Structure formats: structure tokens, C-alpha cells
Amino acid sequence: MKTVPTLSFSKLGCSRGGRQLFQNIDCVLESGHWLYVAGANGVGKTSLLRMVCGLAPIESGEIFWNGTPIHAQADAYRQDLCYLGHLNALQESMTVHENLAFTAALGGMAPDMAQTQSVLAHFGVAGRDRQLVRHLSQGQKRRVALSRLALSQARLWVLDEPFVAMDEAGVRMLADLIAAHLTQGGLAVLTSHQQVDIGAIPAQLLELRA
């Protein structure tokens, strides 16, 4: 049985080019909650998210997943994390199905064809699974990226400006997807320049200041 997931920061700090972006950040995020990382451009929001994803070194302090430093459980932590940014991060030379299967493999899962077809239909890209991503429109690519998020079994979602260039229907679709993830006991960390409404689930605010 899996433990109830918890993400925490202890005295977390980051600098860039000799300039301190943030320091002494303490935070605890528990199952069913989401963290809204706010702040002006250049204060380190993306740097913080990259540290949470393990893509940037932790300069000071520590990030814990279920009470253990993330660097001490890198493989297991990676399987429990799914990232979505303003870019879709899809392999253009692969089919939609291959992209989704690759993501499933990273999470230690085998792709479920019936579930994949159902999710693609839900996001309005049914019948596109054998199509090369390069032949999709930008809107279709974004919906494939959302499908990948929906199919993920990861308990921690890290979302960097996920609503950029999305129409109203897409924004609502993603917000509902995040809300469902939280209701099922997941966690989310996100940053956005747009107003974010995740249903009845209030944000836990972390505001970074220059």
C-alpha cells in the first residue's frame, strides 16, 4: 500500500549569476492539495519547478518526497512525477500512440490501449493515435499533451505555465483534470500568469519576491 504523498521544502534557496533569487523557503504540500507558485518574472518560479523536477541542482536546503530527500530516491521519485509546461514536449517524429507509450514506460507502466483510446476521445483527438505528431495542429498537440497527463499514474504533477495559448475550453478541461487528480489524492505544483480556478479546491500560495 502506498503512503499518503507529501512534498516539502526545507530552507530551499536558489541563485543565478551571483544574484539570490530566493532563500529559506519552507513549505509542506499534502495529498489532495495544490501549490500556486506566484511572483514577478525573473524571481525564480521556473527555477523552483526545475528543482522540484530534479532537473536543476538544489543549491541550498532540501526537497523531500514522503519525508525522504528526492536525490536519495531519484528513480522512484521520477516515476511518481509528471511534468507539463507551456511547450508540449512531444516527439514530432513519433506517433501519438508512441508518445503516450513512451511516457507510460517512463512511469514503469505498460500502455492500456482501451484507456488510451478513451482518454484521446475525451480530449477530442480520437482516431489520431497512429498519426505522426508533426502532422497535428497546435491545438491537437496540446490535447495529446493533456492526454499524457491524464494517463499518468504519477501522484505529483508539476505544471509550468500550463494554460499558455489555450482557448477557454482547453483551460476548463485542464482545470477539471487537475481537480480530479487532487480529488483522487494527488498533488500539483503550478505557476501561471493567468487566473487559476481549480473548482472548489483552494490554492496553497507560495509567493516568491525579488
Swiss-Prot record:
Membrane topology: Peripheral membrane protein
Gene name of the encoded protein: ccmA
A GO cellular-component term linked to this record: plasma membrane
Catalyses which reaction(s): heme b(in) + ATP + H2O = heme b(out) + ADP + phosphate + H(+)
Keywords assigned by UniProt, alphabetized: ATP-binding, Cell inner membrane, Cell membrane, Cytochrome c-type biogenesis, Membrane, Nucleotide-binding, Translocase, Transport
SS bond partners: none
SMART domains attached to this UniProt entry: AAA (SM00382)
Subunit structure: The complex is composed of two ATP-binding proteins (CcmA) and two transmembrane proteins (CcmB).
EC number, UniProt record: 7.6.2.5
InterPro entries reported in the protein's UniProt record: AAA+_ATPase, ABC_transporter-like_ATP-bd, ABC_transporter-like_CS, ABC_transptr_haem_export_CcmA, P-loop_NTPase
Molecular function via GO: ABC-type heme transporter activity; ATP binding; ATP hydrolysis activity
Top-rank EC class of the record's enzyme: translocase
Lineage top rank: taxon: Bacteria
Role of this protein: Part of the ABC transporter complex CcmAB involved in the biogenesis of c-type cytochromes; once thought to export heme, this seems not to be the case, but its exact role is uncertain. Responsible for energy coupling to the transport system.
Subcellular location: Cell inner membrane
Domain ABC transporter residue range list: 4-208
One Pfam assignment: ABC_tran
Chain positions recorded as ATP binding sites: 39-46
UniProt protein name: Cytochrome c biogenesis ATP-binding export protein CcmA
Gene Ontology biological process terms in this record: cytochrome complex assembly
Chief place of localization: membrane
Family affiliation: Belongs to the ABC transporter superfamily. CcmA exporter (TC 3.A.1.107) family.
